[in-house]
Amino acid sequence: TLLASSAASDVYKRQSLYCGIDPTGDSMHIGHLIPFMILKRFQLAGHHPVILIGGGTGAIGDPSGRTTERVLQTADQVKHNADSLTEQMKKLFGEDGSFTMMNNYDWLSKISLLDFLRDYGKLFNINTMLAKDVVASRLETGISFTEFSYQILQSIDYKMLYEKCGVQLQIGGADQGGNITNGIELIRKTNENHEAFGLTIPLMLKADGTKF
């Protein structure tokens, strides 16, 4: 196990970890409760949480848990929602410097199409991507290249935070397991000494079993 193979100094040292939230609305909802409660507990235990606002990925739309294509928001809507979520996160995590707030628009918007295909597309296997539950469940009804590419963008997020902020753990709902492992694999392929991990947690669902 991870703990069994770790030295005591590794287990107790201060860790940086992150959880992302796409600005699909201007407020958190009950479905965000569990992952951000866990992130808050890490903060209270002395670790450093990084909250990633998906200004870039939110402009694309996460296909997880959906049977139909998302309606794309305008750039103004995404920015408004991102700003609103940022203020909510400050209230939850404080403004004492014990956490970091970032927006993936800052790096995703700077990647050209050619760089995306050359630097990242070559590192992802289509067969593996098609096998992910979120994609496989949409093959019959159809999924656009836009939403199909979402998992690559989220992987880039983990790589960027790993390299820039020393983040070694990503927290996400159970439906994000495939995206998280993609990010870990991208880090493995692009960093010689890599230590990146993922933690998935049960989803809080509606009475009919669908996501909030």
How does the language model describe each region?
Residues A8, A45-H48, H194:
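Short glycine-/polar-rich loops that comprise or flank the Walker A/P-loop
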Residues P63-K79:
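A charged helix-plus-loop insertion that forms the helical arch/lid used to bind
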Residues T74-A75, N81-A82, T86, K90-D208:
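Divalent-metal (Mg2+/Mn2+/Ca2+)-assisted nucleotide/phosphate chemistry catalytic cores
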Residues K211-F212:
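A conserved active-site cap/scaffold subdomain adjacent to cofactor or substrate pockets
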Residues I60-G65, S112-L114:
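Short, conserved acidic/polar surface loops in the N-terminal third of protein domains
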Residues T1-Y12:
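Single conserved hydrophobic/aromatic residue that forms the stacking wall/gate
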Residues K13-P63, Q170-G177:
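N-terminal catalytic cores of NTP/NDP-binding nucleotidyl/phosphoryl-transfer enzymes
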